[in-house]
Curated annotation (Swiss-Prot):
Superkingdom field: Bacteria
Record organism: Synechococcus sp. (strain JA-3-3Ab) (Cyanobacteria bacterium Yellowstone A-Prime)
Family: Belongs to the RimP family.
Gene Ontology annotations for the cellular component aspect, listed alphabetically: cytosol
Protein name according to UniProt: Ribosome maturation factor RimP
Any single Pfam family the record assigns to this protein: RimP_N
Protein role: Required for maturation of 30S ribosomal subunits.
Keyword hit for Cytoplasm: yes
Higher taxonomy: Bacteria, Bacillati, Cyanobacteriota, Cyanophyceae, Synechococcales
Keywords tagged on the record: Cytoplasm, Ribosome biogenesis
Subcellular location(s) per record: Cytoplasm
Membrane-traversing stretches: none
Length: 157
């Protein structure tokens, strides 16, 4: 479940990241640890560049100033800024563009047409649906029902 502060924190961090030349990939607030950990994953807007330690440091310093200014998080916490690394999980719009045509596994809840897991080749994603090719047949899954999309690495066509 997404922590209730995440939408506010993302709305603060996303434009800051963009000004610095980064994409905010994901933000998670781990409150089951003491002190809690706010983890922020970034990557350069330029797809040819890798995320460096200096990138993470620059974003961390800038975000720390903003977080202190708005004082959204009560008490002590740890801010961690890092690269998302290589992940099979597709999250951002950029992921869905980069991995178009790749084999994916999509988990939906509630099940769509009686199935909770769909495997096929990614055709794309928009505001309303995630589109897959299943043996040449286009299937459009309601985006609101999509729980996760992962690269499967398996041939499905």
């Amino acid at each position: 479940m997404v922590h209730p502060l995440i939408p506010q924190l993302e709305s603060l961090a996303r434009p800051l990241a963009a000004r610095l030349g980064y994409e905010l990939v994901q933000m998670v607030f781990h409150t089951n640890q003491y002190p809690p950990v706010l983890r922020v994953d970034i990557r350069p807007l330029d797809p040819e560049q890798e995320t460096s330690h200096a990138d993470c440091e620059a974003m961390s310093q800038a975000l720390e100033v903003e977080l202190d200014r708005v004082d959204l998080i009560p008490g002590h916490y740890v801010l961690e800024v890092s690269s998302p690394g290589i992940s099979n999980l597709l999250i951002s719009d950029r992921d869905f563009v980069v991995f178009k045509g790749f084999a994916v596994e999509v988990t939906v809840d509630p099940p769509y047409k009686g199935k909770a897991v769909w495997s096929g080749h990614l055709l794309g994603r928009d505001e309303e649906k995630v589109a897959l090719s299943l043996k040449g047949r286009r299937v459009q899954l309601p985006r609101a029902s999509v729980q996760r999309v992962v690269l499967s690495g398996a041939e499905t066509e």
